């Protein structure tokens, strides 16, 4: 009975001791959560694997201890996960970067951790010193124009204000003879302008099927006639156009003396007329039509009109001649080549309605002249005279249409052009 009381008292004492130790272990665990082994007296204790080293009952392993089979009952580190951890003092024991020298480096996951500019907001910018960090080429205003030192990269002729009009400084680019015409004409395609580069009137005339001849209105004659009441005759000017597309091909300019034109009969006065292809200067004509002063009476001393080629450095070369034989009631003309051989002639009556009563309407508007081959006597060309509405303002202004029909030789075509001009000058150019 006594032994039972002693054992009961001893059990109470052991129970109280265990409870105290349990409270101490709980406090230790709370401290170890912040500093796992900071206050652990056993961390450097070689007897740390002997949990009951300070237990006075260590020699009595079976002294009625209810936890006698629990080796950790008195172990203050029983809940310490680091009790057997050799790195218990290493704060990085659970740190996967324990061997990483940059464990405390906030940029440990930063691919630029070795970059001395890791704290530089421009670390990823190769132009970190460039204030235009978002635009690597921001200092280059020509980033979209790599050749901006050539400011006209996209427009090679940008500095040339005439980029769309390479010859814009030449106001007559589209109309080479603009100074000699009254109305602008559409510029032909390059294939039709090849003659301008060769500057050869033969090349211009060869493909033509016909020409339109328009006499230009001279306001000086109009003012002299209707304002001053004086009949003065000034030099004539003609435009020679392609009959198919109305494109200007030649310009004919008369250069006669004022006294001769106004004082001598038409058959007697000297004639000097220049025919120029477009783009040529007046001092470098293609064809020169000349007639000397002559004293012509009926069939005596009939005039001779000579045509010269001036295209070869202004060297005169005779192309042919035109002679008007005497006739009472008809228009007669003979055309001769350079060898003085008759090639074409015209013999038409002068009794046409448009000749007797010229008016710009009805059957009085047109006059027809037919040119024939000197050998076959077949018709090879047709000249039609047209009376324009300007006839009411200037009575001696006329237009002509010349169809070459069977004529292929460019020299013959030029002779027919000169003949048409001479016909208008002799018979229809009134003083």
Swiss-Prot record:
As cofactor, the record names: Ca(2+); Mg(2+)
Please give the biological process terms from Gene Ontology that the record holds: adhesion of symbiont to host cell
Q: Which stretches are annotated as coiled coil? A: none
**Which cysteine-cysteine pairs are annotated as disulfide bonds in the entry?**
none
Q: Where are the transmembrane segments?
A: 412-428
Q: Read off the Gene3D superfamilies from this record.
A: E3 ubiquitin-protein ligase SopA
Write down any Gene Ontology CC term.
plasma membrane
The catalytic activity, as recorded, is: a 1,2-diacyl-sn-glycero-3-phosphoethanolamine(in) = a 1,2-diacyl-sn-glycero-3-phosphoethanolamine(out)
Specify residue ranges for compositional bias: Low complexity.
24-139
Q: Name one Pfam family in it.
A: Scramblase
Q: Which InterPro entries match?
A: Scramblase
Kindly list the GO molecular function terms attached to this UniProt entry.
metal ion binding; phospholipid scramblase activity
Q: What UniProt keywords are attached to this protein's entry?
A: Calcium, Cell membrane, Lipid transport, Magnesium, Membrane, Metal-binding, Transmembrane, Transmembrane helix, Transport
Q: What does this protein do?
A: Catalyzes calcium-induced ATP-independent rapid bidirectional and non-specific movement of phospholipids (lipid scrambling or lipid flip-flop) between the inner and outer leaflet of the plasma membrane resulting in collapse of the phospholipid asymmetry. Preferentially, mediates calcium-dependent phosphatidylethanolamine externalization. During the liver stage, plays a role in the interaction with, and thus invasion of, host hepatocytes, possibly by interacting with host carbamoyl-phosphate synthase CPS1. Dispensable for host erythrocyte invasion and asexual parasite development.
Q: Which PANTHER family match?
A: PHOSPHOLIPID SCRAMBLASE (PTHR23248:SF9), PHOSPHOLIPID SCRAMBLASE-RELATED (PTHR23248)
What's this protein's family per the entry? Belongs to the phospholipid scramblase family.
Quaternary form? Forms homooligomers in the presence of calcium. Interacts with mouse carbamoyl-phosphate synthase CPS1; the interaction is involved in the interaction between parasite sporozoites and host hepatocytes.
What this protein is called in its record is: Phospholipid scramblase
């Amino acid at each position: 009975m006594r032994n039972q009381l002693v054992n009961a008292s001893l059990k109470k004492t052991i129970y109280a001791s265990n409870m105290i130790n349990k409270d101490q272990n709980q406090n230790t665990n709370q401290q170890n959560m912040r500093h796992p082994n900071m206050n652990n007296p056993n961390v450097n204790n070689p007897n740390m694997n002997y949990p009951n080293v300070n237990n006075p009952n260590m020699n009595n392993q079976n002294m009625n201890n209810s936890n006698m089979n629990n080796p950790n009952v008195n172990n203050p580190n029983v809940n310490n996960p680091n009790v057997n951890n050799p790195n218990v003092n290493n704060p990085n024991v659970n740190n996967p970067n324990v061997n990483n020298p940059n464990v405390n480096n906030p940029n440990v996951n930063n691919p630029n951790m070795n970059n001395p500019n890791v704290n530089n907001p421009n670390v990823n910018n190769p132009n970190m010193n460039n204030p235009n960090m978002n635009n690597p080429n921001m200092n280059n205003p020509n980033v979209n124009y790599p050749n901006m030192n050539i400011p006209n990269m996209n427009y090679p002729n940008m500095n040339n204000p005439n980029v769309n009009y390479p010859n814009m400084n030449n106001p007559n680019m589209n109309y080479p003879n603009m100074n000699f015409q009254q109305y602008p004409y559409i510029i032909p395609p390059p294939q039709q302008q090849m003659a301008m580069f060769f500057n050869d009137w033969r090349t211009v005339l060869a493909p033509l099927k016909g020409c339109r001849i328009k006499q230009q209105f001279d306001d000086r004659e109009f003012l002299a006639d209707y304002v001053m009441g004086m009949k003065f005759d000034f030099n004539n000017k003609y435009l020679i156009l392609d009959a198919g597309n109305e494109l200007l091909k030649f310009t004919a300019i008369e250069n006669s003396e004022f006294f001769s034109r106004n004082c001598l009969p038409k058959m007697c006065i000297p004639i000097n007329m220049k025919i120029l292809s477009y783009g040529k200067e007046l001092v470098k004509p293609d064809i020169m039509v000349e007639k000397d002063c002559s004293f012509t009476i009926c069939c005596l001393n009939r005039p001779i009109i000579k045509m010269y080629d001036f295209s070869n450095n202004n060297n005169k070369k005779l192309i042919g001649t035109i002679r008007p034989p005497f006739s009472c009631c008809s228009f007669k003309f003979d055309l001769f080549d350079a060898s003085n051989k008759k090639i074409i002639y015209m013999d038409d009556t002068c009794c046409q309605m448009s000749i007797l009563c010229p008016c710009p309407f009805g059957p009085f508007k047109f006059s027809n002249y037919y040119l024939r081959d000197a050998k076959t006597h077949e018709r090879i060309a047709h000249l039609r005279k047209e009376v324009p509405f300007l006839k009411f303002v200037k009575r001696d202004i006329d237009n002509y249409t010349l169809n070459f029909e069977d004529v292929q030789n460019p020299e013959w075509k030029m002779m027919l052009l000169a003949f048409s001009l001479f016909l208008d000058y002799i018979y229809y150019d009134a003083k």
